[in-house]
């Protein structure tokens, strides 16, 4: 006998774990004929078990998962599917697909309703300071007039079209001895499995068993919460007879801020300064997310390079559930250089005397050729990738024949 983790599906088909593909097919055909709903109307569940077992064991990938890991292998390797929860629960004593979707079974065995997911847009200020807000939602609740029965006592009858199952099973023959089972929601009862005569229906809910109700939730957005974090209201989703209500889940969506960008518990911002500030020190003020006016000072003599980053410790976002601890604030400096010809040429020599001296120009031996640096617009590209140099003696006619500007430095 092959060494497998579980044999329940093999036992359903009555074959050993090492059964070949032909043996599986032969066993399935025999059992499918015996328990076909047309031949044996009371064996619908048994037919589902047989079909499920054959579907798994006839698929090499699913069979390998099942052989190696048993139920757990199918649990983790399956993508889930509607209507399969009852089959797997009957075979293995537990749901396979319930945990994969929004609908499952609760601990007390009752079917669990779907969760209701709602986006909640919040500002960065809300996430920094915390916020309490009210959210109005519309949901289904059990009708109080009929206690969720849909009509007076005894008026509810089992749907004869689907025999109370809520679904209709259709069998399609693929080949002699091989059939495919398909199921769809019963149109007579809309999947309820029950019908109520129109004269006996509840006047308040019109036989629907539930009515719409407006629910107002008080939502607490705690300090330090993040984009994508969830706030859950357990059991507050739609109600339905015989079903445990699911949860209302609010998904936080952080709105873009005009000054700050968030990275975990840290904040980032960009600040523009002039050349004189970069060289001679500066002071500036900005408004933080809690309304405080923060003064930033940088001493004269300490140079700020273009694009450099400095940090202010402890001025980032508060930590979730530990709001007295905060991340850091990172400030990137955009140094704005003066425009061309901003100073009188006579003053340039005075400025040069104040700045660090130039590096010495090395002596060049041999012939040289002088070229001119021109302005370059990086958004226009480099002229189709052609390697060209802008020479000082280029004529207007020659320039117009080129496909774009020459290689130049970006103007600041």
From Swiss-Prot:
One of its GO terms (molecular function) is ATPase activator activity. The modification N6-acetyllysine is found at residues 39, 152. InterPro entries: DnaJ, DnaJ_C, DnaJ_domain, DnaJ_domain_CS, DNJA1/2-like, HSP40/DnaJ_pept-bd, HSP_DnaJ_Cys-rich_dom, HSP_DnaJ_Cys-rich_dom_sf. Disulfide bonds: none annotated. One of its GO terms (biological process) is protein refolding. It is a lipid-anchor. The modification Phosphoserine is found at residues 78, 123, 394-395. The modification Cysteine methyl ester is found at residue 409. Zn(2+) 1 binds at residues 143, 146, 202, 205. Residues 8-70 form the J domain. There is a cross-link at residue 134 (Glycyl lysine isopeptide (Lys-Gly) (interchain with G-Cter in SUMO2)). It is found in: Membrane. Keywords: Acetylation, Chaperone, Isopeptide bond, Lipoprotein, Membrane, Metal-binding, Methylation, Phosphoprotein, Prenylation, Repeat, Ubl conjugation, Zinc, Zinc-finger. Residues 410-412 form a propeptide. The keyword Phosphoprotein applies. CXXCXGXG motif repeats lie at residues 143-150, 159-166, 186-193, 202-209. Co-chaperone of Hsc70. Stimulates ATP hydrolysis and the folding of unfolded proteins mediated by HSPA1A/B (in vitro). PANTHER family: DNAJ-LIKE-2, ISOFORM A-RELATED. This is DnaJ homolog subfamily A member 2. It comes from Homo sapiens. The gene is DNAJA2.
């Amino acid at each position: 006998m092959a060494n497998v983790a579980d044999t329940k599906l093999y036992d359903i088909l009555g074959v050993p774990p090492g059964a070949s593909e032909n043996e599986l097919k032969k066993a399935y055909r025999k059992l499918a004929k015996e328990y076909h709903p047309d031949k044996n109307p009371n064996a619908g569940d048994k037919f589902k078990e047989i079909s499920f077992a054959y579907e798994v064991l006839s698929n090499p990938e699913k069979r390998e998962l099942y052989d190696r890991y048993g139920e757990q292998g199918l649990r983790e390797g399956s993508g889930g599917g509607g209507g399969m929860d009852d089959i797997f629960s009957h075979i293995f004593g537990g749901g396979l697909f319930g945990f994969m979707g929004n609908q499952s079974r609760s601990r007390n065995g009752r079917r669990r309703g779907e969760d209701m997911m709602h986006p909640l847009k919040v500002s960065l200020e809300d996430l920094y300071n915390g916020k309490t807000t009210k959210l109005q939602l519309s949901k289904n609740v059990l009708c109080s007039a009929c206690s969720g029965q849909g009509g007076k006592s005894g008026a509810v009858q089992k749907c004869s079209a689907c025999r109370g199952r809520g679904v209709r099973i259709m069998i399609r023959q693929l080949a002699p001895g091989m059939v495919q089972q398909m199921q769809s929601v019963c149109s007579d009862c809309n999947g309820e499995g029950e019908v109520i005569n129109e004269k006996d229906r509840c006047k308040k809910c019109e036989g629907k068993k539930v009515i719409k109700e407006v629910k107002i939730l008080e939502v607490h957005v705690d300090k330090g919460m993040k984009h994508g974090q969830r706030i859950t209201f357990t059991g507050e989703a739609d109600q339905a007879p015989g079903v445990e209500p699911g949860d209302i889940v609010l998904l936080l969506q952080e709105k873009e801020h005009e000054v700050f960008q968030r990275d975990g518990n840290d904040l980032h911002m960009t600040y523009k300064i002039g050349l004189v500030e970069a060289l001679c020190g500066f002071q500036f003020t900005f408004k933080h997310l809690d309304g405080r006016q923060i003064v930033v000072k940088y001493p004269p003599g300490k140079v700020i390079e273009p694009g450099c980053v400095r940090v202010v410790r402890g001025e980032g976002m508060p930590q979730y559930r530990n709001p007295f601890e905060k991340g850091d604030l990172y400030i990137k400096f955009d140094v704005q250089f003066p425009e061309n010809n901003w100073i009188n040429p006579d003053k340039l020599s005075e400025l040069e005397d104040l700045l660090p001296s130039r590096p010495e120009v090395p002596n060049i031996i041999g012939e040289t050729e002088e070229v001119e640096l021109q302005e370059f617009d990086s958004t226009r590209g480099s002229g189709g990738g052609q390697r060209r140099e802008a020479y000082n003696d280029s004529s207007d006619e020659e320039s117009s024949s080129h496909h774009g500007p020459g290689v130049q430095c970006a103007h600041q």
